[in-house]
Curated annotation (Swiss-Prot):
It is found in: Nucleus. Residues 239-259 have a biased composition (Basic and acidic residues). This is Transcription initiation factor TFIID subunit 4. It comes from Candida albicans (strain SC5314 / ATCC MYA-2876) (Yeast). Residues 1-84, 230-259, 292-318 are annotated as: Disordered. Keywords: Coiled coil, Nucleus, Transcription, Transcription regulation. Residues 1-12 have a biased composition (Polar residues). CDD domains: HFD_TAF4. Residues 207-232 form a coiled coil.
Length: 363
């Protein structure tokens, strides 16, 4: 395409206007560059000659000599920091006496040590003088742990020694009270209440109605037994006392006694011949046997006569001692009834024990 002369003239005008507008910017740029060059030249001129020479030669600059450190100033500053007089002055100005505070602290430490020593000595004395526990800690802790687990509690009771000691002491006190009540009930069971006679002032223990009835029954039984024995004597089934005395006079009883002694002597002699190594007694000799045997027979006869004199006719025939007074089998001991009576007074947690006790009494 070919441009017209008018268009070319317009383009020239636009170029001229753009150059006129950019001329002040160019001037400012040139001015700034000239200012920078002048500042660089002034800085370069201010540098020392030695530095310029080393830079031009290509070698590294020599190190400058180190300035000496003043140690006196450092030590003085440390002494100032550690000066106790100034610190004391500041504390004294605050109203605090350091020496008095140190003495108080020292006294407190001594008192604390002495108190700890006394406490340890006291604990050792208490442990040495303390009696062993009534219940063993291991078994008691195992029993409490079993009951606690049944109620949903998980705890190690063996670690708590004070609790175990308290429970052991409580059990000991409860059992001692129970034993005391049992002894009191046993005494009341065996003894009546003494009745004091107002006229004479004497006291007597009345017998119970049961003991009176038992004694009357025993007397009746004795009378019936005597009647029965008399009937047997009359019928000739048993020998009377007169027949027994006649036999004694005739020597039948003596002959029987001598016969038994002879048998016993033969048995001992046979035993000694079978075992000759055994010890021999003096009465086994020929001289001692006769005398010993005769003396023994006489003594036995005398004792039988004496016993016959003291015994009643029916007792001598029957060989019975007659009526005996009733004696308590238990004596002064404690029986199950006493213990059950003491347990019933507790009324708390003793139901199963009472049931088992009465079941044993029934058996």
């Amino acid at each position: 395409m070919t441009s017209t002369p008018q268009e070319s003239s317009n383009l020239k005008r636009q170029l001229e206007n753009s150059e006129d507008s950019s001329s002040p910017n160019k001037k400012s740029k040139t001015e700034t560059t000239t200012e920078n060059q002048s500042s660089w030249e002034s800085d370069f001129n201010s540098l020392p000659v030695e530095l310029l020479q080393t830079e031009t030669n290509g070698t590294s600059p020599a190190p400058a000599p180190a300035t000496p450190i003043d140690t006196t100033n450092v030590s003085n500053s440390k002494e100032r920091d550690q000066d106790t007089s100034k610190l004391n002055d500041a504390i004294a100005a605050a109203g605090v006496d350091i020496q008095q505070e140190e003495e108080i602290l020292l006294q407190q430490q001594l008192n604390r040590k002495s108190a700890e020593g006394m406490a340890s000595n006291l604990k050792s004395v208490i442990r040495s003088s303390k009696s062993p526990p009534f219940l063993h800690n291991y078994h008691l802790a195992a029993f409490i742990d079993k009951v606690a687990k049944q109620n949903g509690i998980q705890q190690n009771f063996l670690m708590d020694g004070e609790m175990l000691e308290l429970i052991s002491a409580a059990c000991e006190t409860w059992l001692s009270n129970l034993a005391t009540k049992t002894i009191i009930l046993s005494r009341h069971r065996r003894r009546g209440i003494p009745v004091i006679n107002k006229k004479s002032g004497s006291s007597s223990v009345p017998r119970s109605e049961i003991s009176k009835e038992l004694r009357s029954l025993a007397l009746k039984q004795k009378e019936m037994e005597e009647k029965r024995v008399n009937k047997r004597v009359m019928l000739g089934l048993e020998k009377s006392t007169k027949d027994a005395s006649k036999n004694d006079e005739n020597g039948e009883s003596k002959a029987g006694a001598e016969e038994t002694l002879h048998r016993a002597a033969n048995a001992t002699a046979a035993m000694m011949t079978m075992n000759p190594g055994r010890k021999k007694y003096s009465w086994m000799t020929s001289s001692a046997t006769a005398g010993g045997g005769s003396d023994f027979g006489k003594s036995s006869g005398g004792s039988s006569k004496d016993s016959g004199k003291h015994q009643s006719p029916i007792i001598s025939v029957r060989g019975d001692n007659g009526l005996r007074f009733r004696e308590i089998r238990s004596g002064n001991s404690i029986i199950m009834k006493d213990l059950l009576g003491a347990i019933e007074d507790e009324k708390m947690g003793t139901r199963n024990a009472v049931i088992k006790g009465y079941a044993k009494l029934k058996d």
